[in-house]
Amino acid sequence: MPIALPVDDEANDLLSRNPLALLIGMLLDQQIPLERAFSAPADLVRRLGHEPTAQELADFDPGELVAIFSQRPALHRFPKAMAARVQVLARIIVDDYDGDAAAVWTTATSGAELLTRVSALPGFGAAKARIFVALLGKQLGVRPDGWREASVPFSAEGSYISVADIVDEDSLGKVRSYKQQLKATAKGGAVSDKASAVNDKAGS
């Protein structure tokens, strides 16, 4: 099953067949629109003139990699920090998986092991790691035993709560609507807590 995110065909093709590009896109998916994050690996390929290997990125001069990330339009709003994270990611792939990014999931014997491996990558917090496991299962058919349990709640069938569920503009809209509702709920709770604190202070 190919990746079908709301990015151009070239970017989706790269994400679908190049595991390192998919990991980089997921890593960059923070504090910027997901369209920008998942287009960035294809932009990186264009700037380098070829698809980089993990070994190449691991060995890249850090300053030169930052310069490439910083070219306008920058690959991320924090190009220096993210270039460094991508390089750390590449080094882990080289050191722990013999340079084969796909081995992160193809050699995992269970969903729990897969989640542990993804969680050890830079930029993959608890939620993002579960989302990535869900994305692998839902969109690429990577389904070791227990993958759904390892990636709850993002693995639920028929859900529209993360990038793992985005396959077209309609699903993108549903996921964005869900996230907007979460933000509104969180904001309402914060206002309520503030009002309660004011009332408590007034009553003391």
What function would you assign to each model-found segment?
Residues 10-21, 32-35, 76-81:
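Structural motif
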Residues 20, 34-50, 54:
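A positional/architectural concept
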Residues 48-119:
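Alpha-helical ds-nucleic-acid-binding substructure associated with the helix-hairpin-helix region
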Residues 23-27:
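Short, aromatic/basic-rich helix-turn unit that serves as a nucleic-acid recognition element
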